[in-house]
Amino acid sequence: MRKTKYTFKYTTAYKKDYKRAIKRGLKIELLEQVVALLSMGEPLPDKNRDHDLSGDWVGHRECHILPDWLLIYRIEDDVLVLTLARTGSHSDLFGK
């Protein structure tokens, strides 16, 4: 079976979140490993707890990089785009 490769689209919020993750000393390689799997259309391991979101984030998915480090993303199959929307802690992203 042929693997799909997506192009990337980064939101402005994601770019800011990425810089914040670096300042916090988070291991960016972990985020990049997850993004690499997503870009190749690979399923994420169970430890990443990948799932659909609802409410304001309907149409997006969320996965865990670490227990309190999340990635919110969207795959647009018709144009083969992986949109990286946000990354950060639960409180950063959902105010909880």
Question: Over which residues does each language-model region extend?
Answer:
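A ubiquitous structural signal for well-ordered alpha-helices
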Residues: D17, Q33-V34
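A short, surface-exposed loop/turn module that caps and links secondary-structure elements
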Residues: A36-H64
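Enriched for short, Lys/Arg-rich terminal
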Residues: M1-T7, A13-K16, K23-E29, C63-I65, ...
